Amino acid sequence: QMCIRDRIYFDFSGYSDMAIGLGKMFGFEFNMNFNYPYVSKSITEFWRRWHISLSSWFRDYVYIPLGGNRVSKIKHIRNLLIVWFLTGLWHGAAWNFVAWGLYYGVILIIEKYLLSPVLDRLPDVVRHIYSIVLVVIGWVLFFSSSFGQAADYIRVMFGAGAHGFADRESMYLLTSNLILWLILIFGSTPLVHFRYEHMLRSKKWNTTIINSVVYAALFIVCIAYLVTETYNPFLYFRF
């Protein structure tokens, strides 16, 4: 499930960035759609960083017209449940998408009215683990075809499956691709971006040459992968 977590992030964030880049080529400026969501320390923060365009649309055209948070507690809870029910339904008229949306709606309500003071007192690493675990469970609901399948995945995640946390095949695949997985985890954090920006701001480096070399290298690598790949559509193209 951690691999699914990374796949959907790089899949969706990747083609969102491609759209932003293509827009720039034609003189259009598009807002960032993903802001390193997997560094979040709460689900509330996660949804400020994940699929920002969708969250902003539902906020502006559904949540605020319903009264937003300028209403009573009961009505605010109602507003959140309506927004997240519709967010799930936006992805498809299937139980798993609706359950996924309501799952996040309930968590956001609990964080707002119960957990927020508790989370604020916890160490950052604990809050981060809390966020990642809930997000991964969310992806289980999103991709499962039945409640039974979702329950089986969640049991295995917590070591309650027939083979514990993973069977031999899963462990083989994990160890065989461990370096790639670590690169993906590292790439989903802002560390590379911050380091690159720091280097560009340093007077020791010629930013024009650095940008040209980096972009050319990335372009060559991308073309090489495209040439060797078969047809592999983006996961989010169906939404």
Regions found by a protein language model. Give the residues of each.
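Membrane-embedded transmembrane alpha-helical bundles that form the catalytic cores
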Residues: Q1, R5-R238
